[in-house]
């Protein structure tokens, strides 16, 4: 019964993502029910086979946040930077998804993990997320810890460069949101359909 309930939650999350990203509803719903044939915007993982995600970082309050905080509820994880316009748009899409899920009484924790911890300190993350949704959790930490976690999620990203045309920094990266189970295991990842640069 619990597995059926979790499966229904996942389907509803998938549908909410589809509504926000503009993917055809029926195709996504069909894909959700047949994960072995899933081809549109997401990849699935067998929860029993997936290892638990392990990390220890620092949140926007300057407190330790480790992987045990992912247990007991569903989580959506997004990697990016505070200075990227595209990441700002992506997080606002995630915020829209959360609003849809709340109407279905589905509680999902959102975790934003910076790919530039040298710039995105706890203080920077706190100010940034207050403008989007102060219920979101922002994580930073040592460069090597971020690199190891990004590697666990297979996140692609490049070194930060300064764009003289825009007078801003840019860091190119893959643009996925990751769904984590209440056991702290990877379930699916979804493409938000935004440009990868930023």
Swiss-Prot record:
Domain of life: Bacteria
Gene3D superfamilies: Glutaredoxin
Membrane-crossing segments per the record: none
Pfam families, alphabetized: SCO1-SenC (PF02630)
InterPro entries tied to this protein: SCO1/SenC, Thioredoxin-like_sf
Family, per entry: Belongs to the SCO1/2 family.
Name of the protein: SCO2-like protein RF_0043
């Amino acid at each position: 019964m619990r597995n059926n309930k979790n499966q229904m939650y996942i389907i509803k999350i998938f549908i909410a993502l589809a509504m926000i990203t503009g993917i055809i509803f029926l195709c996504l719903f069909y894909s959700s029910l047949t994960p072995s044939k899933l081809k549109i915007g997401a990849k699935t993982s067998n929860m029993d086979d997936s290892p638990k995600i392990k990390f220890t970082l620092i949140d926007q309050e300057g407190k330790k946040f480790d992987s045990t905080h992912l247990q007991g509820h569903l989580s959506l994880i997004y990697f990016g930077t505070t200075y990227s316009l595209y990441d700002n748009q992506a997080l606002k899409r995630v915020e829209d998804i959360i609003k849809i899920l709340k109407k279905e009484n589905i509680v999902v924790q959102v975790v934003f993990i910076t790919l530039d911890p040298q710039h995105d300190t706890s203080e920077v993350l706190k100010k940034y997320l207050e403008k989007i949704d102060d219920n979101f959790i922002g994580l930073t930490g040592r460069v090597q810890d971020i690199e190891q976690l990004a590697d666990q999620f297979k996140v692609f990203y490049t070194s930060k460069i300064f764009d003289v045309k825009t007078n801003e920094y840019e860091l190119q990266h893959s643009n996925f949101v990751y769904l984590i189970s209440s056991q702290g295991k990877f379930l699916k990842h979804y493409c938000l359909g935004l440009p990868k640069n930023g």
